């Protein structure tokens, strides 16, 4: 799994039938210091994440192992909304800004 910040949404009115009713998010991969590290990623949203939230996402075959993405042509899926993380017993991120 990888860390990312949700930076936008993607709307598609015409798509492959198995992708109907999926919400898509635009993600930017980040490191544990919240610095952007990669390209943009389009991911199906399995958890109801919103713009500005930090999330965990998976790609490849792992992305197709959620109930929502099973048997669907998804290459990336948001699997969790991050509340906080600690490294070496130091709080590095808190969703509500306490870090």
Regions found by a protein language model. Give the residues of each.
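A generic local secondary-structure boundary/capping motif
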Residues: 14-16, 44-46, 66-69
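C-terminal structural segments of small proteins and small subunits
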Residues: 62-99
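Short alpha-helix capping/helix-loop boundary micro-motifs
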Residues: 39-43
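A structural micro-motif recognizing beta-strand termini
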Residues: 30, 44-46, 60, 82
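N-terminal first-folded block
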Residues: 1-37
């Amino acid at each position: 799994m990888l860390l990312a910040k949700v930076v936008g949404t993607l709307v598609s009115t015409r798509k492959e039938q198995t992708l109907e009713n999926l919400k898509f998010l635009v993600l930017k991969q980040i490191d544990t210091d919240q610095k952007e590290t990669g390209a943009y990623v389009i991911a199906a949203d399995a958890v109801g994440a919103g713009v500005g939230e930090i999330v965990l996402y998976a790609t490849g075959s792992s992305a197709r192992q959620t109930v929502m993405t099973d048997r669907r042509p998804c290459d990336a899926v948001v699997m969790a909304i991050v509340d906080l993380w600690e490294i070496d017993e130091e709080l590095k991120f808190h969703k509500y800004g306490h870090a």
